[in-house]
Amino acid sequence: MIIDLAIDIGSTNTTIFQYGYGIVLKEPTVIALRQNRKIEVVATGAKAKRLYGKVSGNTQVISPVRDGVIVNSEALGLLVQDFLKRITPESFLKPRIKALCSIPCGLSLAERKQYEIVLQKSGVNEITIIDAPIALSRLIQTNGIVMVTGGAVTDIAIVSNDEIIEGITLNVAGDAINNAIIDHLYDKHNVRIAQATTEKIKLEIASLYPNDNASIDVIGRDIDTGAQKNFLVSANEIYTVISPIFEKLTEVIVSMLSYAPTEIADETTENGIYLCGGTAQIPGLSEWIANKTGLKVTLLDDPSSSVISALGLLSGEREKVANLLNLKKM
């Protein structure tokens, strides 16, 4: 029995697509481990994430991928192993698992190899590693700038004829927004807020519309007294916090185009930017990037699932993948 998978292991979430079935798993890239005589898996995914701040002693809650890089290969291996166990049927005969796995385009050779090693130890028999922008070229089917902005990193790449001409991975994405909001509220309102509150602010009122009048009531803890404190946060206030973050990304795009060969730069300018990833869903971002760069911006359908959708298409096209990666044999 052969199981054909596409796997997107992000710093925030891991998504698995099974050929013939679609997306079969989407869970936080988090695992809780207990260290006794041997390591014991306490919880994985959403259940493990709910344990943050609630465990002590010999139990740890671990995020094994940080900024797109594997920082705890043993923990990630156990996490992927558990995820695979969930989606593979129980059988006397162990299935042969083939997997196409996307990674950020800016990883080193050693960092890329680490994904292959972890997947192999987790029970994947045949592994193909592909840069996320290359995978997305199958979905977009045209040349241009691919921008994938997720939880921890943003990939920006000029893609031409299924090849990355210029590409970079930046540690500027959803987590950077959360941290900027936390720092701002600490400085301006003299409060500490929970991570869940930060996420709520981002999801409900963060936008790149400078005149957005939305606001939200927030509960935090006063830094000086430790008492609970209620205060109002406006979308306009958050705009001033997050716009410099995206300013960095647009500066990279403009710089990247200036170094690209003339013909490719002209073609890229004509086709514009293809935007996806969870953070791409911030209201007004497409228009803001278009205004800052002077380029057309296309927000892909279901942006948070664009990478796994592209991988899913490629999982049934092994010859296409071989061509993309210049391989003679998969």
Where do the model's predicted regions map?
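Nucleotide/phosphate-binding catalytic cleft detector across ATP-hydrolyzing
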Residues: M1-T149, V159-I273, A280-D302, V307, ...
